[in-house]
Amino acid sequence: MSRAVIWHDIECGIYAEDLALWRSLAAEHGDPVLDVGAGTGRVALDLARAGYRVTALDRDPELIDALEARASGRNSEIVRVSSQALVTTVAADARDFDLGERFPLAIVPMQTIQLLGGPDGRAAFLHCARRHLVPGGVLAVAIAEVLELYEVVDGFGAPLPDVREYDGVVYSSQPIAVRADREGFVLERRRETVTPAGERTVEDDLIRLDRLTATRLEREGAATGFTAAGRTTVPATTDYSGSEVVILRA
């Protein structure tokens, strides 16, 4: 398993608060579902286990390869649902893809749309998404309008790290800061590994989220042919920030 897959699983894979929402939308609008920013399959595999067909798109081929393996015949939870493949994987950039089919529902979980490089990146994605939806199809996008800001100093007040062990190596991902600037938010984590021999590595990882409100996303959607069709929320928990989910109709 690659380092990219391990870190993605540790930092993103256990989040489950939004899964019921995506299942509910799939039940309402039908499948196949286009999952944008699918990663290693947190949402796509959950939908497949519920019996929905999913096309999972992510720009990172290592993550997509891991998802492909997890969705294959070796995954008995999915095989029991259907003898046909329920998950199709695509390695592509959300700002520039052409799948040759249309979907009744496209979902963008976990603030993926805020990773696209600002208004131009979002516009490119929205044009792609619009072309891939059937008439009346729905695009559901999770965003974070605000985040609680903090910075860990000398370990004081640090959130608990996410820790896993793979092949004897301990991986720890420690959130150490959420900062804001004019463009958005910067999320900083400290990644640490310790081998069975005691060898230790430490590196910092930064993720930038573009600043985005539900109202602005609805305006940008209207400029690309969408109609605002409501909003819902994923509540915050003690460990995770909540999300505003914007519903756009093609």
PLM-predicted stretches and their roles:
Residues 208-250:
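C-terminal lobe and adjacent flexible extensions of AdoMet/dcAdoMet transferase-like proteins
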Residues 95-105:
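A short acidic, Gly/Pro-enriched loop at the edge of an enzyme's catalytic core
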Residues 37-39:
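Class I SAM-dependent methyltransferase "Motif I" SAM/SAH-binding loop
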Residues 140-215:
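SAM-dependent methyltransferase
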Residues 123-135:
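A short glycine-rich, Lys/Arg-flanked "PGG" loop and its adjoining helix->strand segment in the class I
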Residues 45-96:
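Class I SAM-dependent methyltransferase SAM/SAH-binding core
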